[in-house]
């Protein structure tokens, strides 16, 4: 029996009415080149319509477990952030549900992990991320950066894929520095305070912002990239020095633990929106960051753990660099505790650890390659005399 001429199983056409036929492993099933092209176009359209958020939304427990690998302590903050970020992206996956956006305010002293938490979240979720410093921003008409430049950084990190940027995370640091100077609105414009809050308010609450692709100040004749900010998660961070006195006055306490030097493990007193308004944040701005997350000051033990425990801990980084030279590097507990003590004395928290350790290690990293030693033990005295660690290593190896 003569087989019928093959035809496209999708459009029904036969060559030469259509292009070349591609045969399926299933007998007598074909697709023509024209239908392949149409299928690719349909898939591309579907991909463009699909949300550009995380490819898979991890549960809060998974998010916190990832944060645990990089951020030491701050258990309550990590739990709260994990739930908040999960709910934010769950809301985007279900646009039919009318759930408002809940931006996040992180309160804690310098070096407690505010920026690290935001960075780690964005990296884990694989969404675009941008950091801005609120102190560099000014309202339109003043010297400084327009608030839209915050979104430009997000666009740049999304390779100018606008839809992907619109699902990103923005961390704005030093947000406490744009508090107005008094609780009562001033008759004059406060360039570094209320005006910037008002300008930021528009993009934080959700608007279509016109972003200058080259950055800098906007002018009438340049082209803009429209960016809808309604689904961008804004995480705001600040030390809010002096806020403890406002909370203390409200609750009638004489001590507070969320800023300054820690006394044992006391819990920070709860900050409420009214405290932030008294501090100098405008009510509308406070209302757009309803989740307030407080971070503990870090103690000596915390800083030692930060040096050694995270996946990318400083000690592990230095050990890997020396291992590449065939040298095993060990740090004594006494040396690590002294690094932590010096960082605490500087008042820079975890941020000061790298500077202290780098200063001590630079001479050692200069001399050790090619020295022939197999193991270096870095002890407390070597913080100020690092080359003694190399001399002692040579003596041990020779004996």
Curated annotation (Swiss-Prot):
Domain spans labelled ClpX-type ZB:
1-51
The role this protein plays is: ATP-dependent specificity component of the Clp protease. It directs the protease to specific substrates. Can perform chaperone functions in the absence of ClpP.
Q: What is this protein called?
A: ATP-dependent Clp protease ATP-binding subunit ClpX
Residues given in the record as ATP binding sites: 109-116
The subunit structure is: Component of the ClpX-ClpP complex. Forms a hexameric ring that, in the presence of ATP, binds to fourteen ClpP subunits assembled into a disk-like structure with a central cavity, resembling the structure of eukaryotic proteasomes.
Query: Is Lipid biosynthesis there in the keyword field?
Result: no
Q: Which GO terms describe its cellular component?
A: HslUV protease complex
Nucleotide-binding among keywords: yes
The record's GO molecular-function terms, alphabetically, read:
ATP binding; ATP hydrolysis activity; ATP-dependent protein folding chaperone; protein dimerization activity; unfolded protein binding; zinc ion binding
Source organism of the structure? Thermus thermophilus (strain ATCC BAA-163 / DSM 7039 / HB27)
| Binding, Zn(2+) | 8, 11, 32, 35
UniProt-listed SUPFAM superfamilies: Glucocorticoid receptor-like (DNA-binding domain), P-loop containing nucleoside triphosphate hydrolases
Query: What are its GO biological-process terms?
Result: cell division; proteolysis involved in protein catabolic process
- List residues traversing the bilayer: none
HAMAP family on file: ClpX
Checking InterPro entries in the record gives: AAA+_ATPase (IPR003593), ATP-dep_Clp_protease_ClpX (IPR050052), ATPase_AAA_core (IPR003959), Clp_ATPase_C (IPR019489), Clp_protease_ATP-bd_su_ClpX (IPR004487), ClpX_bact (IPR046425), P-loop_NTPase (IPR027417), Znf_CppX_C4 (IPR010603)
Q: Which domain of life is it from?
A: Bacteria
Q: Which family does it belong to?
A: Belongs to the ClpX chaperone family.
Which keywords does UniProt give here? ATP-binding, Chaperone, Metal-binding, Nucleotide-binding, Zinc
Q: Which gene encodes it?
A: clpX
């Amino acid at each position: 029996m003569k087989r019928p001429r093959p035809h496209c199983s999708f459009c029904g056409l036969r060559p030469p009415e259509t292009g070349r036929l591609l045969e399926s492993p299933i007998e007598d099933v074909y697709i023509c080149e024209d239908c392949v092209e149409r299928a690719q176009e349909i898939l591309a359209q579907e991909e463009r319509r699909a949300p550009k958020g995380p490819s898979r939304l991890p549960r809060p427990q998974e998010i916190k477990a990832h944060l645990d690998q990089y951020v030491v302590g701050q258990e309550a903050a990590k739990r709260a952030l994990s739930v908040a970020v999960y709910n934010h992206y769950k809301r985007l996956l279900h646009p039919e549900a009318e759930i408002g956006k809940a931006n996040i305010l992180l309160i804690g002293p310098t070096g407690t992990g505010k920026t690290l938490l935001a960075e780690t979240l964005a990296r884990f979720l694989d969404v675009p991320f941008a950091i801005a410093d609120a102190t560099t921003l000014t309202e339109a008409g003043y010297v400084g950066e327009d608030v839209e430049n915050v979104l430009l950084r997000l666009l740049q990190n999304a390779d100018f894929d606008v839809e992907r940027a619109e699902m990103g995370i923005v961390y704005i640091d030093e947000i406490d520095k744009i508090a107005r100077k008094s609780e009562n609105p001033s008759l004059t414009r406060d360039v570094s305070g209320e005006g910037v809050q008002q300008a930021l308010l528009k993009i934080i609450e959700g608007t279509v912002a016109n972003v200058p692709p080259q950055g800098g100040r906007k002018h009438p004749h340049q082209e803009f990239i429209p960016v809808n900010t309604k689904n961008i998660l804004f995480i705001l961070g600040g030390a809010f020095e002096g806020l403890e006195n406002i909370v203390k006055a409200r609750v009638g306490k004489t001590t507070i633990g969320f800023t300054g030097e820690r006394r044992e493990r006391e819990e920070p007193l709860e900050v409420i929106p009214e405290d932030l308004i008294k501090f100098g944040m405008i009510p509308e701005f406070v209302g757009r960051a309803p989740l307030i997350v407080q971070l503990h000051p870090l103690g000596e033990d915390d800083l030692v753990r930060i040096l050694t425990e995270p996946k990318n801990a400083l000690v592990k980084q230095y050990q890997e660099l020396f291992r590449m030279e065939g040298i095993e590097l060990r740090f004594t507990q006494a040396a690590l505790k002294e690094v932590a003590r010096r960082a605490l004395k500087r008042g820079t928290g975890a941020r000061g650890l790298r500077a202290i350790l780098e200063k001590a290690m630079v001479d050692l990293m200069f001399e050790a390659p090619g020295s022939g030693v197999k193991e270096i033990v870095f002890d407390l005295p070597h913080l100020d005399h690092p080359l003694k660690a190399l001399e002692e290593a040579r003596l041990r190896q020779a004996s």
